[in-house]
Amino acid sequence: MLRARIARWLLVSAVFSAGVSRADCADVQKAPECLPRFYQVAPGVYRGGQPKDGGFELLKQRGVRTIINLRDEHDERERVEALGFHYVYLPMDARDEISAGTIQTFLDTVSDPARQPVFIHCQRGADRTGFMVGLYRIAKQGWSPEKAYDEARDIGMRWWYRGLKRQIFEFAEKAHPEGRGAAGK
């Protein structure tokens, strides 16, 4: 398992160190290089890491309407708004408690058909993005916290952010106090 993760990390590093030009991102086959950890969560909901050069343009071609930035950096607003996206800035630190207000704004935005399709990202598309997608899975898709956390971990959430794991389980308790979703869905 660890060897597979290391091999995957080396492969991803090699791809990114090779460099990708904006013209390459016009080719849909180059999506993994332009949009790290790009993945469809549900119809109208996508996740990934910080788009590389040309990545936002590729998202536009795919019909994405809203960009949700979970990074502390706020440097992409002008660029994504110029491309016609709706921009939602929800900065968070994976080491801190994520506020209920931030979580609710996220869930409201992702669930609003007028804002879909949405693309959610942080720097790596793993820790903060994995956390928020896990909450979406629990709240909107009825997933168990175990399944939501396992998916986040499998996509790259790092184990040392124990507060994120704890919050996923606490959120599930509040979202489904009767135990719905805990059956492993």
Please report, for each region that a protein language model flagged, where it lies by residue.
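Bacterial N-terminal signal peptides that target proteins for export
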Residues: 1-10
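Cys-dependent protein tyrosine phosphatase-like superfamily
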Residues: 2, 15-119, 131-185
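Short cysteine clusters
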Residues: 122
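Substrate/cofactor-recognition hotspot
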Residues: 125
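Conserved lysine of the Walker
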Residues: 128
